């Protein structure tokens, strides 16, 4: 695959050695991601108090404590929304420091809605195959939960927040890191480094294994290829967000070692080894996911190569 318009449109300082600029890009991406997560964790307490106080002021009689309790009941919404801090850091850097346009992050208008639809469909297909293999192979089982209206609305309302969370991770590691490295170096190196950082960032998650990290890296490679193939961030935003949403809030899997607050299905893990079931990390720790991702990577790569031959 060749570099698209996103990468070609990036303004960089050619005077800085490629090795130095690559190290700087990796450091800055890590710093913005960890810094944004730290900021969101520091603000959760004051934010809940502020909401409780304002609500009590405008709607007296509810009680600050009860409002705060309500806030923590919906804490997953805040945790996902808080990724906006990371997104804003990258937008500020691109617009103010780099003086590049947001299109260099992949935010292009052309076909954006179509790519969102493709990304959602791709994740539904991938997770559908994984769930089917789990069920038919006796690796685990799914049971439909009896839910009232409130948890159903809770689950449905989470989808755009998962898109924000997953999309922000894609902007950080693919839209910014991959494209900046590729602008100075080559695409294989950019995809390898951005995917490796993506895997490293998950090392602290509960239940992490070698296979789970490998799958995260493979997913990063897939996302990198999709970004280059579409020359847009929108497909990988939708693919990543939907992947997490379907895992946790539809199928009841752990999402990279983190449990979902509510789900349409309850998942019961079988008695097989962790490399098969995924263990505490969830489906992303299973060899089944490895195979699905490998097939996806090969298909996208071949599609990209075919498109380039057609253009030539």
What role is predicted for each listed range?
Residues 168-193, 225-232:
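Membrane-interface helix/loop boundary segments of multi-pass membrane proteins
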Residues 1-102, 248-312:
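N-terminal, membrane-interfacial amphipathic/helix-forming hydrophobic leader that caps
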Residues 162, 187-203, 216-220:
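Small-polar-interrupted transmembrane alpha-helices in polytopic inner-membrane proteins
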Residues 82, 122, 197-198, 215, ...:
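Transmembrane alpha-helical core residues of multi-pass small-molecule transporters
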Residues 140-145, 201-210:
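Membrane-interface helix caps and helix-loop-helix hairpins in membrane proteins
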Residues 80-88, 152-159, 172, 214-221, ...:
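Membrane-embedded alpha-helical segments of multi-pass membrane proteins
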Residues 19-27, 77, 116-121, 152-156, ...:
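Hydrophobic alpha-helical transmembrane segments
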Residues 32, 36, 40-76, 98-168, ...:
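Juxtamembrane helix-loop-helix connectors linking adjacent transmembrane helices
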């Amino acid at each position: 695959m060749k570099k698209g318009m996103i990468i070609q449109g990036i303004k960089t300082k050619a005077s800085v050695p490629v090795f130095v600029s690559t190290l700087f890009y990796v450091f800055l991406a890590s710093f913005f991601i960890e810094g944004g997560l730290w900021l969101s964790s520091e603000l959760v307490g004051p934010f809940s108090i502020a909401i409780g106080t304002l609500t009590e002021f405008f709607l007296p009689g509810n009680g600050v404590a009860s409002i705060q309790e309500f806030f923590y009941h919906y804490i997953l919404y805040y945790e996902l929304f808080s990724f906006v801090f990371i997104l804003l850091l990258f937008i500020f850097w691109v617009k103010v420091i780099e003086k590049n346009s947001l299109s260099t992050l992949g935010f292009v208008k052309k076909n954006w809605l179509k790519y969102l639809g493709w990304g959602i469909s791709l994740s539904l297909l991938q997770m559908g195959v994984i769930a089917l293999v789990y069920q038919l192979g006796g690796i685990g089982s799914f049971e439909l939960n009896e839910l009232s209206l409130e948890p159903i609305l809770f689950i449905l309302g989470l989808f755009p927040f998962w898109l924000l969370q997953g999309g922000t991770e894609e902007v950080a590691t693919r839209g910014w890191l991959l494209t900046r490295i590729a602008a100075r170096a080559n695409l294989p190196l950019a995809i390898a480094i951005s995917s490796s950082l993506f895997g490293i960032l998950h090392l602290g998650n509960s239940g992490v294994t070698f296979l789970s990290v490998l799958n995260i890296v493979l997913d990063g490679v897939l996302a990198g290829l999709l970004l280059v193939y579409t020359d847009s961030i929108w497909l990988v935003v939708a693919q990543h967000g939907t992947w997490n949403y379907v895992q946790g809030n539809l199928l009841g899997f752990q999402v990279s070692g983190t449990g979902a607050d509510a789900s349409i299905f309850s998942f019961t893990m079988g008695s097989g080894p962790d490399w098969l079931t995924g263990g505490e990390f969830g489906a992303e720790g299973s060899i089944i996911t490895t195979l699905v991702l490998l097939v996806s990577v090969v298909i996208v790569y071949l599609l990209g190569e075919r498109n380039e031959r057609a253009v030539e």
